[in-house]
Amino acid sequence: MSPRIAWALILHGDNPADAGWLRPDEAYRLRKRIETLSDDPDPAVRLQAWLANRADTHHLHAQDVPAVLKDERLVPSGISDPRSQMSAARRGEGYTRTDALEDLTLDHLLVPATPARSNFTLHVTAIMPMRPVPEVLLAADLADRGGPRETIRSGEVFQEWLTHQVGLR
């Protein structure tokens, strides 16, 4: 799924026509795809695949994770969202806009790191999600981490999101 379509799903869920940037045929196809999730035995895996292109992901090392998470140019997500029910005091995750990346990186002395050595996952996108991030975005971020606790919680959050979609209850 392209980033444009993925963000229509993230921000508008079962009403993709509300995304002013989709053509009517794209909104219709996205709505039909969402409807297939109610019959899917593992909708979390499918949604994770659909949302794979939602942002550019940077693995970084932060000197002061709490300070980065408090920065207004960042929206916490994944393990940093309280709804994740994860305890990640020394790690952080969040979204920032493409045009804020350079300043955020400089202000917090964020340096690139391998995924194994990073303590901050920064998702960079042209579309800034609201605070708190939509459930479907939280679930996708948790699924991307791949750990057993994150995977289980991701599935639970995806199910919660599905129950909120009109016509999929």
Model-derived regions: residue spans:
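Basic, Lys/Arg-rich alpha-helical nucleic-acid-recognition elements, primarily the DNA-binding modules
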Residues: 1
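Phosphate-handling catalytic interfaces
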Residues: 4-7, 11-169
